Amino acid sequence: MLANVPRLKALMRKDGFDAVIATCAENVTYLSGFWAMSQWVRRGPQAYVLFPGEGHEPTIIVNSSLLDLVPDQNPWISDIRRYGYFQIDTDRSVQLDAADQLQHQLFSSKAYKNSVDALVGAMKERGIERGTVGIDEMGITPQCMDQLQAALPDIKFVRCFSLFERVRAIKTPREIEILRHAARVTEGAIDAALSIAKEGVTEREMLRRFNAHLVENDAAPVVGCIGFGNRSAMINVQPSDRKLKNGDLIRFDVGGRYRHYRSDMSRGAALGDPGEKIRKYYAAVEKGVLRGYDIIKPGLRVADLFKEIVATVQREGIPHFARSHVGHGIGVDGYDPPNIAASSVDVLEEDMVICVETPYYELGFAGLQVEDMVRVTKDGAESLMSLPTGLRIL
């Protein structure tokens, strides 16, 4: 189980929810361990997890076309409700293995007409026909929400995506283990990409090597911003046929996904001497991140972390440095709470995993960025990284 269920139950009690319903891809996977593929690859497909209060088991609601993923993934929730038609046949002359037996059993179960009918059926079986139910508003379509409210008029449905965010902000030991591995694999991909760095290599060639390393290590590419020279100042640079030249800066702002969890990090390198200004400015953004390690601990106001990191970069060499944020949480989503911004009202808590970053973009010059994945410990900070933060000269 990935989810921090004790925290979920505590927040449900605090907010007065009799049940909560996960509807977006990240929350469905987080709460159940079930990866509803169609939710992740296109907009619109409906999958839900009903999580009642004490005394009732949770339920996964999923389209019949995804039932094969249940034995493949073995989610901790055993009650699976399907909806929609999908035909699959069984060769009755052979002995089915355990996975196929479970598939056959699931395809033999009742098929509801649509996702809302399946959800309503599960709720009524559990006696959830009145009271207050939290619903993650980010995945359910407006039409489905209208149908749900019409079918259960005595329930007060309250938006609760923010509740799921609060739950996900504090990671379990298993989540931290996965995030640590995701970071290691992504660092290896940066090393792999830089191993081919020489004059004439293109940004696209470097991205291909980066992505290949992720796939070879059971991860999937998600973000691959790799830019050379002045193109490194493009905020969301997409690799092109730009060739690497001596003196170029190489900026990585990259990430992948491993076992449903994200990685996000940034590093810089240069082919030969990049010049004094790049060295000076890079050292400033690096010191901003390192200053974060000095002060991160439970109870620190996130807004104060933001202010100290920005002030450090300004003091260390970029006096005009300005940012809307200098990091964010990370987990099943690339941007979990907290958002490290001046406006944040959050405080750091033990076992948050955050990305601390100090990007600087100057058109006509370069983009410089250091970003680390960091766990908040009971008395400080633990880096999930192994690569040095300094500018790497190739």
Indicate residue ranges for each PLM-predicted region.
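Active-site neighborhoods and metal-handling regions in enzymes and metal-associated proteins
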Residues: 1-394
